[in-house]
Amino acid sequence: MKANIACVQMAPKVCDVKHNLQKMSSYVHEVMESNPSTNLILFPELITSGYECGNTFTQIAEIAGEGPSFKTMSNLAAKYHVNIIYGFPEKEEKQSNIIYNSCIYITENGNLGGVYRKVHLFDTERKHFKKGSDFPIFETSFGKLGVMICWDTAFPEVARIHALNGADLLVVATNWENPYSDDWDLVTKARAFENCIPLVAANRVGTDEKLSFFGHSKIIGPTGKVIKALDEEKEGVISYTVDLDDAKPLRKNYYTFFEDRMPDLYKRLLSP
């Protein structure tokens, strides 16, 4: 199965949801008007809010499937018949004081397809967000998606769990900051290679209060080779048609990671 993927590299305005949604909408229009056959549009982590919102996160967080960002993006998804994934601060439905750093998946029909809550929180995120507790697979018309958010990508266990659960594509939404671009380039290629699964990653650009972000959004093949990337620290979009079936013969010839695994010897990995 082939999937035409668009990866948006954008600079959000910190704590300004209305502005960011207008900008996101413009990118959706741009992508779909230039390539109506696009299957998936991916935005970065916390793209509706920006990264350094501090206590304001509690004011602008949304319940998944409700709120301004979902209404705006679901209408666009249905209009263009395209799947959309983006990062946002999520408010737990019954506990308004509990906030997650989440990615929402909206189906090509404009429905809520699922939510992933970031498990590996980084640095100051722990002051504002509660960590997630599972790694769901999102079912689409073109294949299964395993989503990671930023620091999750530094942990090989996450991508491996997605692979074992049948993911056809690894999807990463991030706010990876300067000066750690080399680390970002390394871990994204490694996660694709060690699981022999293509990976698409959207990082933001611009500056919030203190941090600046370098972009380097990319699409990586199942052997870890970068197929297409935005290397400059500026806004833009990359699009590419990924053949999700390419990995299958590779896993039988040389990239035999799953055939050669020895889970019985890995019990130490489950210990603290």
UniProtKB/Swiss-Prot annotation:
GO molecular function ontology, one term from the record: omega-amidase activity
EC class: hydrolase
Residues covered by the CN hydrolase domain: 3-244
Active-site feature positions: 45, 118, 150
Superkingdom of this protein's organism: Eukaryota
UniProt keywords, alphabetically: Cytoplasm, Hydrolase, Nucleus
Main subcellular location: cytoplasm
Gene3D superfamilies in the record: Carbon-nitrogen hydrolase
GO cellular component: cytosol; nucleus
PROSITE patterns: CN_HYDROLASE (PS50263)
Protein's GO biological process: cellular detoxification; oxaloacetate metabolic process
InterPro entries associated with the record: Aliph_Amidase/BUP, C-N_Hydrolase, C-N_Hydrolase_sf
CDD domains for this protein: nitrilase (cd07197)
EC identifiers of the protein: 3.5.-.-
Keyword GTP-binding annotated: no
Subcellular location: Cytoplasm; Nucleus
Family listed: Belongs to the carbon-nitrogen hydrolase superfamily.
Name of the protein in its database record: Probable nitrilase C965.09
